[in-house]
Amino acid sequence: MAGGEKYERPAIAGSGTIATGLAACASVASKVLLLARSDASAWKAEEQAHSLAAKIDGGDAKRIKVTTQAGDLAECDLVVEAIVEELGPKVDLLQTVGDAAADADLATTTSSLSLDELASQSGHAGRVFGLHPFNPVVKMDLIELCLPDATNDEIRPRARTWCEAIGKTVVEVPNEPGFVVNRLLFPYLFDAVRLMEQTGMGAEEVDSCMTLGANYPMGPLALLDLIGVDVAVAIGEALHADSGEDHHRPPGRLIALVDAGKLGRKSGAGFYEYD
């Protein structure tokens, strides 16, 4: 396990929106290594992380280094897995980075998959814990922290210190699927989609009701586009598999959007069209 009171050599494993946002935030506190799976994804991730770092007070693009080699993580004391919300790929990555960075604490950004399964199947139980940020990472203040029973208690203060150092507010949450935010949020989002299915209302009409009537900063359909429709489906499927409750089941319209490649903002189309 990592020693000391704080992380000095963090790494982020992933090249998507959450990974690059975390890398940008981490650059406020120290150098950070970003692990991508291919040269093409590494180039895109570096460009995105550098761009985001420039938008953060104290962010420093020069502190962000990108690699495609897991062996480069050998000296890291924290590795944060931030890839697709699927058990198999996350387990494989945690196993790989845990072997490569033998002394590092291992965080996962999941909120819907079982931390206990991720820890046990990766072979690194005791080192794995949950750090769940929110999209867009550079703007959202919260990180949910979750330590399974098997996780070394010494990780807790290190994790809190790091999150605060990169400008986030930490709330420790129970080891339950969805933690707090997604457990409350996704039934609401899915109900908005079902309302469209049942009534024929448009996305703008539903969103306007919530932004103007409930003073929400963003409507549920626009928020689904921001989260990523595919990510929302994956989270819903994981929540439903655990609870069996209908309000966790992704609506058919969401699944149809994924099948059509309409994943929200990142693909240029979802419930709305984007330039």
Where are these regions (language model features)?
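Rossmann-fold dinucleotide-binding core
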Residues: D105-P174, F179-R183
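Structural motif
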Residues: A13, T67, A82, T108-T110, ...
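NAD(P)-dependent Rossmann-like dehydrogenase/reductase catalytic/cofactor-binding core
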Residues: A2-K6, S30, R37, E164-T169, ...
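Rossmann-like dinucleotide-binding cores of NAD(P)H-dependent redox enzymes
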Residues: A36-D60, L147-E154, V170, P177-L185
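Rossmann-like NAD(P)-binding element
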Residues: R37-S41, A54-D105
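Short glycine/serine/threonine-rich phosphate/pyrophosphate-binding segments
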Residues: I18-L22, G88-K90, S111-L115
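NAD(P)+-binding Rossmann beta1-loop-alpha1 motif at the extreme N-terminus of oxidoreductases
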Residues: M1-K55, A100
